[in-house]
């Protein structure tokens, strides 16, 4: 069976003398594994479109164990990402996230579109990286079915409290009367709550110029990191560690 679909290259591994094994996040088939035969030959028609991050259009043959790339045309190479180590590291973090949370063969059109928009934003030189990455994280959790409750207490639905905490296990805010519902819940400021709501509700293209303080970014980053860990069991994102040192 042949299918034609757009997709992003998440991973490219050498196989044999001239072949490549690809992990592709596609619009029509979700995350797939595919072999690109002869793709590493210098004159291969597939070579340009199978580089990491590439957004390409593929003609794929579905075999018993994996797909075979019959044709591939690069639509966007994302050269600016490759020329800036910090942007490259954050883009690699997004790839790690998507690969960690997606299931082979399961489509997620909203996540596919979000991933594409975010990569296109990261290649621009005049954007604020931190709010874009935080927006991607919180929207990703929403699209996986873990939308955090940020408008009221997840336990009693109260909208008022002396101080909020965020419970990764309960999936949202806890008011001061409900702290006992999760003894490991993390303190979260009212400003961070408002920022999280903004990032969750707005299209990611609307946050590209948003400026947030390092303190606020760090607060929300820690909370989202715990939230992602709780629901994906993925903690060690090497690319994020590299990006944050730059």
UniProtKB/Swiss-Prot annotation:
SUPFAM superfamilies membership: ArfGap/RecO-like zinc finger (SSF57863), Nucleic acid-binding proteins (SSF50249)
Presence of the UniProt keyword DNA damage in the record: yes
DNA repair is among the record's keywords: yes
A Pfam family hit: RecO_C
Name the record gives this protein: DNA repair protein RecO
Organism: Alkaliphilus oremlandii (strain OhILAs) (Clostridium oremlandii (strain OhILAs))
Function: Involved in DNA repair and RecF pathway recombination.
Cysteine pairs bridged by disulfides in the record: none
Family to which this protein belongs: Belongs to the RecO family.
Keywords: DNA damage, DNA recombination, DNA repair
BP-aspect Gene Ontology terms: DNA recombination; double-strand break repair
């Amino acid at each position: 069976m042949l299918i034609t679909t757009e997709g992003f290259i998440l991973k490219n591994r050498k196989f044999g003398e001239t072949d490549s094994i690809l992990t592709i996040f596609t619009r029509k088939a979700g995350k797939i594994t595919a072999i690109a035969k002869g793709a590493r030959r210098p004159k291969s028609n597939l070579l340009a479109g199978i580089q990491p991050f590439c957004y390409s259009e593929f003609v794929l043959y579905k075999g018993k164990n994996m797909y075979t790339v019959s044709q591939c045309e690069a639509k966007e190479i994302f050269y600016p990402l490759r020329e800036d180590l910090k942007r490259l590291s954050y883009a690699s973090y997004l790839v790690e996230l998507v690969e960690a949370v997606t299931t082979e063969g399961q489509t997620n059109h909203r996540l596919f579109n979000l991933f594409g928009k975010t990569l296109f934003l990261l290649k621009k030189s005049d954007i604020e990286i931190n709010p874009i990455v935080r927006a991607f994280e919180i929207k990703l959790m929403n699209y996986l079915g873990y939308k955090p409750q940020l408008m009221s207490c997840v336990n009693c639905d109260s909208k008022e409290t002396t101080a909020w905490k965020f419970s990764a296990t309960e999936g949202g805010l806890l008011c001061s009367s409900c702290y006992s519902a999760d003894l490991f819940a993390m303190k979260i400021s009212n400003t961070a709550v408002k920022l999280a709501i903004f990032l969750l509700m707005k299209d990611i293209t609307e946050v590209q110029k948003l400026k947030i303080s390092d303190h606020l970014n760090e607060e929300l980053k820690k909370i989202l990191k715990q939230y992602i860990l709780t629901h994906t069991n993925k903690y060690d994102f090497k690319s994020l560690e590299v990006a944050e040192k730059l």
